[in-house]
Each structure stands twice: as C-alpha cells, then as structure tokens.
UniProtKB/Swiss-Prot annotation:
Compartments it resides in: Cytoplasm; Nucleus
Lineage: Eukaryota, Metazoa, Ecdysozoa, Arthropoda, Crustacea
Full protein name: Heterogeneous nuclear ribonucleoprotein-like protein HD40
Native organism: Artemia salina
Ranges where the record places region Disordered: 1-36
Disulfide bonds, paired cysteine numbers: none
Asymmetric dimethylarginine modifications at: 102, 105
The keyword Ribonucleoprotein appears for this protein: yes
C-alpha cells in the first residue's frame, strides 16, 4: 500500500502477489479539486481498485452508508455509480440506513 504521507507498504497476497493501493486522507480545511465546496471532516480515497477487482468480474452491488443525522448519501451514490461503472455494469446500488441496522457487530456488549 502507498500512503499519502509518502510511506510505502507492500502486503503479500495469498498467491504471493503484491498489490499497490494509494490511500489519501483529507482533513477539514484542506482544499482539493474533488472536495472544493464540501464541508467534510475526513475523506478517504482508495485508488487502483480496477486492477484489484477486475479479476473477480462484474460488480453486482454497491452498499452506500447514509448518515442518519444529515441523511447525506445522494452525491455519493451518483459519484459511486460513475466511479464503479468504469469497472463494469452495476447491477444494484443499496443505501445502508444505520438506524435500521442495529446488530451486535461481531459480539455482544
């Protein structure tokens, strides 16, 4: 993995392959061309996904989380369709509503 602060990490895959993924973390106040006009505390961008996911075939679905307070997800749905559409046909997009999905998340508390 290549991290935006310049550090580079390589993680071996099960078949011995190495996969490079660029990760950028954007903090509030930073101005980037794709964040202009957005009031976001943090953004995470993971690139080089086409090489990684293309070996698995067509994308059948995308699960997008909706903020229960702001209800924001519309712009992310549009951007996700355009972005993931370049890797193949999108069969389904599902919005994740945190208020309806109250599970144990891997254990009891």
């Amino acid at each position: 993995e290549e991290v935006s602060n310049g550090q580079e990490h390589t993680e071996g895959m099960x078949q011995g392959e190495x996969n490079x993924i660029x990760v950028e973390e954007h903090h509030e106040g930073e101005k980037n061309s794709h964040l202009v006009g957005k009031d976001e505390e943090k953004k995470l961008f993971v690139g080089a996904l086409s090489e990684h996911f293309s070996k698995y075939g067509e994308i059948e679905g995308i699960n997008i989380k909706v903020d229960p307070v702001t209800g924001r997800a519309g712009e992310h749905v549009i951007n996700s369709k355009a972005y993931f559409g370049q890797f193949g046909n999108i069969v389904e997009v599902e919005l994740f509503d945190k208020t309806k999905a109250r599970g144990t998340r891997g254990g009891q508390r």
